[in-house]
Structure formats: structure tokens, C-alpha cells
Design a protein with these regions (language model features):
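Short N-terminal segments immediately surrounding and downstream of signal-peptide cleavage
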Residues: 22-45
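Active-site scaffold of zinc-dependent metalloenzymes
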Residues: 50-86, 99-100
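C-terminal segment of classical bacterial N-terminal signal peptides
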Residues: 14-20
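Bacterial N-terminal signal peptides that target proteins for export
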Residues: 1-8
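Soluble non-cytosolic domains of exported or imported proteins
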Residues: 25-26, 79-88, 134-142
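Metalloprotease/metallohydrolase-associated module, dominated by Zn2+-dependent proteases
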Residues: 30, 107-167
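Non-transmembrane alpha-helical segments in soluble domains
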Residues: 32, 86, 90, 94, ...
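Catalytic Zn2+-binding segment of zinc metalloproteases
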Residues: 93-110
Length: 167
């Protein structure tokens, strides 16, 4: 929490002289705060601190009553790069949404559209999903990679609807 607050304060201070292209950083930290408000521990970890970070940009682990942690791996992610940070936070936040929803964020009927959009806008993601994931993980990761392509306002809205407004 202390690391998150320090990093957020430094980022917001930098934004006071930043260009408009860095606006996504505000949304990334807004989304991190929303994630934290669900009770999820949010952490920004270097590889030397977190063995699970090696080779990953980030990860989310949820085991009911055992573990609920969202991590951005700072050795692989330049947290000062707006796009890079947003991609990781939006992707991993989708897994938080999936945990809140007990499965996919959107109805399974939308998956073909999700895959078509990935093939059209981010064919490297479509190929990665096809080669690396199997079973239910395919659909879960497709949603997460698709979420990276969405405007920040949409991701924030999806998160709010899925995790914060759901009773």
C-alpha cells in the first residue's frame, strides 16, 4: 500500500507538467485504486522481490479466503510508459472482473466477436492465445487481451459495473 501510494503520488506530480498523451496514467492509477477497493492487494514488484514476476508483465491470483493479489512486474513494465502500464493494468483487471463475476465478464455468445476483433486489431494477440492457451483459459485470456484495446473510460465502466456495483 505504501509503495502504491508513493508511486501514485510521484506519477500525479509528474502529470502536472505532462502532455495530454500521458492521460492514460491517471486512468491506470484510478483503475488500480478501484481494484484495491475490492479488497484485492495491489503491488508493484521487481523480480528480485517476487519470483512469480520473472517473464511476466503482471499477474492476478485469486483463491477464495486464501489469496487475492494483483501485481504489476516492474522489471518488465516501464510504469512511466503510459501505454505499457495501461495494457498491463487493463489486462490483469479483466481477471479481477472475471473473479467478481465468477467467470467471463461478458456473455459467452460474444466470444466470436471478441476473437474477430483481436484478429483484426491485434493479430499477434490472437496468435498468442491460439498457441499458448487451452480450455477455459482461452476465453478468459481473449477477454483480457481484448480489454487492452478498449478506451480507458470503457474499462473503468466495465470494472465498476462488474465488481463495484454488483450486489
Amino acid at each position: 500500500m505504501k509503495l502504491f501510494a508513493t508511486l501514485a503520488a510521484a506519477t500525479f506530480a509528474a502529470l502536472s507538467v505532462a502532455t495530454p498523451t500521458q492521460a492514460g496514467t491517471v486512468e491506470a492509477y484510478q483503475l488500480l485504486k478501484m481494484i484495491e477497493s475490492t479488497g484485492t492487494t495491489v503491488s508493484l514488484n521487481p523480480n528480485s522481490y517476487d519470483e512469480s514476476c520473472k517473464g511476466k508483465a503482471g499477474y492476478y491470483v485469486f483463491e477464495p479466503k486464501v489469496q487475492d493479489i494483483f501485481v504489476v512486474c516492474t522489471d518488465q513494465v516501464n510504469v512511466k510508459d503510459t501505454d505499457e502500464l495501461w495494457e498491463v493494468v487493463s489486462h490483469e483487471s479483466t481477471h479481477v472482473m472475471q473473479a467478481c463475476n465468477g467467470g467471463l465478464v461478458f456473455e459467452e455468445a460474444y466470444l466470436p466477436r471478441t476473437f474477430r476483433e483481436l484478429e483484426r486489431k491485434a493479430p499477434h494477440y490472437a496468435k498468442l492465445i491460439d498457441e499458448k492457451y487451452t480450455g477455459d483459459d482461452t476465453a478468459l485470456e481473449a477477454e483480457a487481451f481484448w480489454m487492452e484495446l478498449q478506451p480507458p473510460s470503457h474499462v473503468l465502466s466495465y470494472f465498476e459495473d462488474t465488481c463495484l456495483n454488483k450486489k
